[in-house]
Amino acid sequence: MNTISPEVKTALVTGTDHGVGFSLAKKLLSRGYFVIAVRIDETEKQIDALQSSYPNQMAIFCADIGSDESVFKASNDIKNMTDHIDLLINCAGILGDMNKNLGDDLDFDEIMRVINVNAIGALRIT
């Protein structure tokens, strides 16, 4: 069941919990886009407040961009909403534990977790 009209420009933005992803979602809403906001943290309420200002112009989905299963579930839910996305903006990213990434004893599991989200995650969501 598609609920977004094909005439409406639709943007999917990841990392909308806060920061750049949140700011871009806000700007796109002000320009008339329907925004599909993807976040990882349901406790971040900033994006919820934005949705209350644009209730008919926004949908929020939770997904861990570092997880195939999580992205697959979110993408199926999004496909039920729309059959088109005009603009995809990948803003989801993590720094990881900097002590494990920059210290003398590198933690390669932590480094791979960061790469999985920041590099592979962008491909996964695309």
Label every model-predicted segment.
Residues L95-M112:
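Conserved mid-core segment of classical short-chain dehydrogenase/reductases
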Residues D17-H18:
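Conserved glycine-rich cofactor-binding loop
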Residues C62-K73:
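The beta1-alpha1 cofactor-binding region of Rossmann-like NAD(H)/NADP(H)-dependent oxidoreductases
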Residues G21-F22:
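N-terminal Rossmann-fold NAD(P) dinucleotide-binding loop
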Residues R31-I47:
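Conserved glycine-rich Rossmann-like NAD(P)H-binding loop of the short-chain dehydrogenase/reductase
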Residues I89, I125-T126:
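Hydrophobic positions on the long internal alpha-helix
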Residues T10-V13, L88-I89:
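Conserved hydrophobic beta-strands of the Rossmann-like cofactor-binding core
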